[in-house]
Amino acid sequence: MLNSPVLSIITVSAFDEIRLSKTMNSLARVSKNVEYIVVIPENDLGSKNIWEKFKKDFNSTTKIIHDKNIGVYEAMNLGVSQATGEYVCFWNSGDELISSDSLDILIEALQSAAPLWLICQGDFTWHKPLILDNSELKGFVLHEPAKFISHQTVIARKSFFDNLNGFNTRFKVAADTAQIILMSQITMPYFANIQVVRVETPNFASHYQRRSRSEIVLISLLYLRGTKRVKAFHNIVKAELIFLYNKFTRKRI
C-alpha cells in the first residue's frame, strides 16, 4: 500500500472515557507515519464521543472499530486485522507518550534496523522498570512483578504477528506474555534504548464488559478482602504463567 503508516498503535478499551481521552490527547498531532486505532464495544457511546472529539486533532490516520463485547485479546486481534501499518503495538487506555518526539525516534529505529520485532523502554510509575540487554531475553521470572515485559513496549512487524495467528485467546490473562515467548523462540528482539510510553496503572475494572477479563474485575473489587474467589483467580493467573514459563524453558536452546 502506498503511503501506508510505519506504525499502528491499537488501544482496546471499554467504558473508560477518562483514560481514553488521556491517551488520545497524547497521540494527537503526532507523525503522519503513525496510525491510531481504537477498539470499543458497539454500545460504548461514551468512548465513541471521546474519539469523535479528538479525531480532528490528529495529523495521522485514526479509526474506530466497534466489536460485540468480545474478549480483550480477541479485540486486540480485531484491531490488528484492520491495521495498515508495517508494525503494530498495543497501548492501554491511560498510556501516554513520554515526549513529543518519542514516536519519531522510534520510527527512525524501525526503519533503520527493520526488525521482526522490537522492545523499547517504558516509564512505569507503579513499579520498578525492567532493564533489558541484548544478551538474553529477561522477564519471565515468577513471583517477581517488577520483572516482566510490558506489551506496551513491544512493537512487532504486522506480517510477523499475522503469521503467528495473533494472540492465543485460550489464555485469559497471559496471551500477551505467550506471544512474547513465542516470538522470542523464533528470533530475539531488537532492543532499542528509547523511552516511548508512560504506562498507566492498570485499570482492570474498565474491561468489565469483556468476557476474557471478567475475572480480573473480581480482583480489582475484592483484592483486599482475601476471599476464596480471589484466591481462585490468583491460581488461574499462576497456572497460566507457570505453563508458559515451563514451555519456554523446555524449548529454549
Predicted regions and their residues:
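Cell-envelope/extracellular polymer assembly enzymes that use nucleotide-activated donors
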Residues: P5-S8, E35, A178
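Conserved nucleotide-sugar donor-binding catalytic segment
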Residues: I10, L132-I216
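Short, acidic, metal-binding catalytic loop of nucleotide-sugar glycosyltransferases
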Residues: N25-V34
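Short beta-strand/loop segment that forms part of the nucleotide-sugar
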Residues: N33-L45, I65-H66
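A conserved acidic beta->alpha catalytic loop
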Residues: I40-W51, N92
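Glycine-rich, basic loop-to-helix element that forms the pyrophosphate-binding segment
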Residues: D67-A83
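Short aromatic/hydrophobic "clamp" motif used to bind/position activated sugar donors
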Residues: V88
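Conserved donor NDP-sugar-binding/catalytic core segment of glycosyltransferases
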Residues: S100-I131
